[in-house]
Amino acid sequence: MLDLTQHNELVITQQVEHLEAFVGFETANRYNIMTEEGQHLLYAFEESGTISRQFLGSHRPLSIHVVEDGTRHVFTAQRNFFWFMSHLHIRDDSDKHIGSLQRKIKFLGRRFDLEGPDGQLLAEVRGRLLRPHTFMIHKPGGEEVARVTKKWSGLLREVFTDADTFRLQFHKDLDQDFRMLVLATAFAIDMDFFENNNKRGGFGFG
């Protein structure tokens, strides 16, 4: 399996189908994960129902599968349908539960809790009100250990598609499991905060 500890910066780019871009029909999310230099490392794809994508929007139940070389499984992030606060569970290639991501209520910003397999708090993901595209990941003691930033994709790409690009930065001492949790965090941020339900269909829950 790819050793994520060898990469302290990654870029995630979303792939958008022409049907979704021009008609607004919600298709399953797909992402390329690469180095800052553009070297392809991993591929991620959503598994969900067509009807739930159209009518439940960003609240739909789904799984995100991350694979290497097209077939080798790296990890899966899974969540059930939710009304208010999403809860994403992450399992590695051996189906071991390595942690979860729980969205929390925050009135002046955005927040997730990163939890270990036993529910212990590993880190807080904080998005400030005045910096809506930057999410900082802090250990309980306050040290920032990772960051997820939504990058500007260009005017036409931003206006006519929902395609997003994210930059991930890791502290050099983070282990493999924690880096997988940060990758899953980027997917959750995209689905919870940057999916355009008005264009993508759905009842506009979130």
Could you tell me what each predicted segment is?
Residues 1-63, 72, 79-86, 93-96, ...:
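Low-complexity or membrane-interfacial segments used for flexible interactions
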